[in-house]
């Protein structure tokens, strides 16, 4: 039986690339390209659309979604999809595939923090030998240290593999005991529940935040959690800014309650109205014990290609009546 051609709403493809090349579908689909503002199309553009490719969905968009079968997120996070706004029968699926570059970023900043790399570069290019051994140091090494991971999904597991390659002890925690077997296969001690998280916080030399932002993880790393960490430890967050309490983190770094941090995900982002905002209410940029990057740890060509492939596969699955992959259970 011949199926109707799907209408798919997408943002404009770059450099005049054909939509079917950017999103490599095998099916014959009707593409509608439109400019997104603050990650969203004009709500009226959803009218008559079967598939919406995007990261945000609002009540206003729902009002025009008369045919919407699926929202395909070309990213991992789904916190900007308002679940209560979804039309009946609309399926939401994401596309992660960013664990490899994020894990590389994590290990890069871990070494950089230990070796005071940014501070050393900043002073040395001005002609100062302030970080020369004998005048500063000694520096530290990853070997034989403890890497703690909060959240043992794809990113956490990838980081665990790399940390083990540095001969580090790796401990991880999650909300349930579901990951015990895979952790054991990777040589990782897995602790679950609140007690497990307490153990990871107190024992880690490096603490990776790798859990999704959902209601139960909002401000998960708060003042109490930061206070339970070693004063010599580092916090690394490529997940979502609001998992770590903004003020508590700033105070912990400013008062040297922890040794430092590397942060890739923030509390404020560019919008149509504010193109270059400061990423936080608090002046993290004035501190000397933080590495700040603009949410780019997973933004590689490989990630983009893998995500596009997953979105395309789900379009093909929807066309042929097969169940989608990576479906979000709200």
Each PLM stretch: what is its role?
Residues 1-51, 171:
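N-terminal glycine-/charge-rich "phosphate-binding" loop or analogous flexible N-terminal tail
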Residues 58-65, 83, 216-235:
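Rossmann-fold NAD(P) dinucleotide-binding segment
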Residues 103-122, 164-168, 309-317, 322:
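Oxidoreductase and adenylate-handling cofactor-binding alpha/beta cores
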Residues 232, 238-330:
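Rossmann-like dinucleotide-binding domain for NAD(H)/NADP(H)
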Residues 136-231:
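Rossmann-like dinucleotide/phosphate-binding beta-alpha-beta segment
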Residues 57, 76, 211-213, 239-240, ...:
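Short glycine-/small-residue-rich Rossmann-like dinucleotide-binding loops
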Residues 48-125, 139-140:
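Phosphate/diphosphate ligand-binding glycine-rich loop within oxidoreductases
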Residues 42-45, 61-64, 199-200, 225, ...:
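Structural alpha-helical scaffold elements that stabilize or flank donor/cofactor-binding regions
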